[in-house]
Amino acid sequence: MYHISAEDIYLFHQGTNFESHQFLGCHEINWKGKRGYRFAVWAPNALKVCVVGDFNNWEENSHPLEKFTDEGLWGGFIADIPPATSYKYHICSSEDTSILKADPFATQAERRPKTASVIPAANGYQWSDDQWIEQRNTYDPYSSPISIYEVHLGTWKKTLKKQFLSYRELATQLIPYVKSLGYTHIELLPINEHPFDRSWGYQITGYFAVTSRYGNPSDFKYFIDQCHQHQIGVILDWVPGHFCKDDFGLRQFDGAPLYEYRDPKKSEKKSWGTLAFDYGRPEVQSFLISNAIYWLKEFHIDGLRVDAVASMLYLNFDRYDEEEKIYNTYGGEENLEAFAFLRKLNKVVFSYIPGALMMAEDSSDLPLVTAPVNKGGLGFNYKWNMGWMNDLLSFMEKESIHRKWHHNRLTFSFMYTYSENYLLPLSHDEVVHGKKSLLDKMPGDQWQQFANLRLLYGYMYTHPGKKLVFMGGELAQYAEWKDTEELDWHLLEYPLHKGIYHYIKNLNELYQQHPELYELDHLSEGFEWIDPHNIDQSVIAFRRKANKPNQELIIICNFTPQVHFDYKIGVPESGRYKEIFNSDSVRFGGSGQINEGEHFSFPEKWHGLSQHIKIKVPPLAISVFQIEVERERLPRE
């Protein structure tokens, strides 16, 4: 019926139609010699479904749909409707109530505060990123540098009239800016349609609709296309964990729970005032997995960061009172349907897009999140390392004189860093809701705060794991993220803030030019401690290695403002060592305690290694050394 195949219908109800957006929703077709639009919607509890909109003056009964499957699919054809027309579904429920709903599969929506779906224009966008897509197919993310600039498009920068920049304006401003800083990827906070600006996109009503705040779908494709032509990947925050309760959205779509669990205990997400998807329902699986495939295929998105995974996996994620708690059939707290859904999602995504990035924002200690599904894992590429982030920020917030009492928070991450493929996040969540900006978290006077911030970033970039920094991190903002205003761009007029900007740029350059810092991120062979035990002085030293034999860097971090002279560091090879990076450089706003010239190794064991060098350890800083060449003769001490 209406060019909808029996196979598509069958697979949708089996939970295995992974491109169900191709037949559900609104699509332009030829039907019986007429040009128009086919509408199809899943509403099994409805007694009647009509399409209403601008084209029929929102008359409730003028364009009824036909129920063409026993499982509740409704469809119809309407001729001579122009593109960009607004519409909704008028649904009469089994409770004999009438409701107006936006189309769950709509690819465009009205700009808030309006809430209707919009009939899309013909898809005429011509992509120019063939070379990027081709190289993505053979891309190995594990041995490649990944440095992500996390962005909320509405508050990165605004027009002179304090309005949002459009997708096309962002393409001309944001992309060159990110490229100049040296990032490899942009990660966008959710751009699915959402009614409330200050939800940041995490409470969605239109899963297939790119938000109209910044333009239309073609404009967003242009933005992504330009990213790819500048060799920048694009990752979307994707929210399959919950959806908002607005009346026009998915909640009780046909008058009864449909996309959400029927049991309110299971569906309620109390922390956010939202509803959980019913992961055990086949049609919901088809809806969500189709949505993931839609963004990856239709918009050439390079990866998805799956939001709030722990809230999906655990039935009692935000339930603390015993009488509120629920359990699975085996008496456990795991949502077994969510486990199965995520495994299915990742298997399907990688079958469609082998080079995709699938990243789990998971705050739990569940093992095997990034292990393959056939080995009992969830099948993600990467997991956000929330433990590293929490421990490190807690450590850095301590006055330097007290850090020795919390040394384990600095080093504990290495007890588990190779148990998963990790990404190290300094995300938007850490600079909002009274948590303070990264700079404001740092203790000490102004100089120490900036030095601590440089040290924080430096330790992050030399620690195993891919990198993510939220926008504004390069400006060293004093204020936390203001989710209604643009970044504090005026700070770049001040030398210390400008120094952080240049520092981030140089860190990205160091990171990408040295495979020691990324090539073996996922293997323990890529890291070796030199000295993790200097608790009293809060100095640590370690080695980062690449695949090539003897290609390695020596990293020293000093977490106090004390300068150490003639400090011995064990090194593995005899030769000349040169400092190639120092966060205390004057050009970054530091005090200039750098190591100039070459440092010859001495044939005396130190830190369990056959050689050592003597260096100056700068205050609240990170130093990176590289062996230059082996030498024939060692000087006397």
Curated annotation (Swiss-Prot):
It catalyses: Transfers a segment of a (1->4)-alpha-D-glucan chain to a primary hydroxy group in a similar glucan chain. Signal peptide: none annotated. Its EC number is 2.4.1.18. One of its GO terms (biological process) is glycogen biosynthetic process. The keyword Glycosyltransferase applies. The keyword Protein biosynthesis does not apply. SUPFAM superfamilies: (Trans)glycosidases, E set domains, Glycosyl hydrolase domain. Belongs to the glycosyl hydrolase 13 family. GlgB subfamily. Catalyzes the formation of the alpha-1,6-glucosidic linkages in glycogen by scission of a 1,4-alpha-linked oligosaccharide from growing alpha-1,4-glucan chains and the subsequent attachment of the oligosaccharide to the alpha-1,6 position. NCBIfam families: branching_enzym (TIGR01515), PRK05402.1 (NF003811), PRK12313.1 (NF008967). Monomer. This is 1,4-alpha-glucan branching enzyme GlgB. It comes from Oceanobacillus iheyensis (strain DSM 14371 / CIP 107618 / JCM 11309 / KCTC 3954 / HTE831). The gene is glgB.
